[in-house]
Design a protein with these regions (language model features):
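Positively charged n-region of N-terminal signal peptides that target proteins for export
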Residues: 1-4
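Surface-exposed amphipathic alpha-helical segments
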Residues: 35, 43, 88-101, 140-186
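Sec/Tat signal peptide C-region and signal peptidase I cleavage site
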Residues: 17-23
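Bacterial N-terminal signal peptides
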Residues: 7-16
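Solvent-exposed coil/turn segments that connect beta secondary-structure elements
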Residues: 33, 68, 77-79, 124-126, ...
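Short N-terminal segments immediately surrounding and downstream of signal-peptide cleavage
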Residues: 23-42, 183
Length: 186
């Protein structure tokens, strides 16, 4: 009996030591933007520009995380000046995400009364695999995107889906210890 317990304990210790170091997942929330999600790694906030043939040029806010050679991004594109064209703008963003890539999955999705689309694509030149969800909420395109880089190589990792599916638009569903997302840099 003692030998079995000792063997089990030894195997558990060995399994713990061989597991890759991964950052803990934390909840993040933006009350002004009205959404929450979970992500691992250190948060970096960036401003950018989105350009589309229909949408034109718009400011973006990107919350970026990298862990274990997987890049996680929450992208917010301010489209309040064209909110009446929501379906067209959302379709254009999805098209641009999948354009020139091998589309593996393209499906409709719904989260908390918000309809959207989910896509998974293989990046060109063996550049990795990316999965994303797009929603049009309150005049903004909100997209969660996870990209497994070639250095990771596990293109079927559940971490992409865990990130993309963690979004909620009912901020009350965010964890109590969720970190408030900072305002964009000026």
């Amino acid at each position: 009996m003692r030998l079995a317990a000792l063997a089990t304990l030894g195997c558990a210790a060995l399994a713990t030591m061989t597991a890759p170091a991964m950052a803990a997942w934390r909840g993040y929330i933006s009350h002004p933007l009205g959404f929450a999600f979970a992500a691992p790694g250190e948060l970096k906030v960036e401003k950018g520009t989105y350009r589309g043939d229909v949408a034109g040029q718009h400011d973006t806010l990107v919350y970026r995380f990298v862990d274990d050679n997987i890049e996680y991004k929450a992208v917010v594109i301010d489209m309040r000046d064209k909110a009446n064209d929501a379906a067209t703008l959302l379709g254009e963003a999805e098209y641009m995400f999948g354009n020139g890539k091998k589309v593996l999955m393209d499906t409709f999705g719904r989260v908390d009364r918000q309809y959207g689309r989910k896509l998974t694509v293989d990046l060109p030149n063996n550049g990795g695999r990316s999965s994303a969800a797009f929603y049009f909420v309150d005049g903004r395109i909100v997209s969660l995107q996870a990209t497994v880089l070639p250095a990771n190589g596990d293109y079927d990792t559940p971490e992409m889906g865990r990130f993309v599916d963690s979004i909620t638009f009912f901020t009350i569903r965010a964890p109590d210890d969720a970190i408030e997302l900072p305002a964009p840099p000026k």
